[in-house]
Amino acid sequence: MKLLVLWVFAMMATVAMSRRWTFVRYHYINKAYEVTMKIQIISGFDRQLTAWLRVHGRRLTNNQKKTLFFVNRRYMQTHWQNYMLWVKRKIKALGRPAAVGDYTRLGAEIGRRVDMVFFYNFLSGRKMIPPYSAYMAKLNALRPADVPVKNHGK
């Protein structure tokens, strides 16, 4: 039940962020660009979680903390297409071919600007952190560069 509520919440946030009810077309980018963006996004989310855990983490178990790290990765996977819409707009505004550094900067900006603390407070305050499962451990064990996304680079 907790996972269902978490999933519904993520889908509502997806629709709210995309501001549309239609299908978001896939945007494919070079594998090097994808990897650098994933690393920066997940590291930004993990920095927010680490800071949040320093303040609020005493009342959470180790498994709940691991689940919140899973939430970071799943949130990035869920919203990848919407990030790509924003990134494509920013790259187009540069007026030149993109470089790896541009995608690094944009990934870091996404990781910094998305307020994940809201989700941590929401999940922990309502006792909605789901139990830690094997599929969560499998995703957490992956390096940020290896986290699968729907439209992986070529």
From Swiss-Prot:
A single GO BP: single fertilization
An annotated GO cellular component: acrosomal lumen
InterPro entries: Egg_lysin, Egg_lysin_sf
Lineage top rank: taxon: Eukaryota
SUPFAM superfamilies: Fertilization protein
Signal sequence coordinates: 1-18
Cellular compartments annotated: Cytoplasmic vesicle, Secretory vesicle, Acrosome lumen
Pfam families: Egg_lysin
Predominant location: cytoplasm
Tissue-wise expression: Sperm.
Keywords recorded for this protein, A-Z: Cytoplasmic vesicle, Fertilization, Signal
Function: Creates a 3 um hole in the egg vitelline layer through which the sperm passes. Does not have enzyme activity. Species-specific interaction between the sperm protein lysin and the egg protein VERL exposes a basic surface on lysin that may dissociate the egg vitelline layer via electrostatic repulsion. Plays a role in ensuring species-specific fertilization.
Summary of subunit composition and partner proteins: Monomer. Homodimer. Molecules associate into dimers and then rapidly dissociate again. Interacts (as a monomer) with the egg vitelline layer protein VERL (via VERL repeats); each VERL chain can bind multiple copies of lysin.
Protein name: Egg-lysin
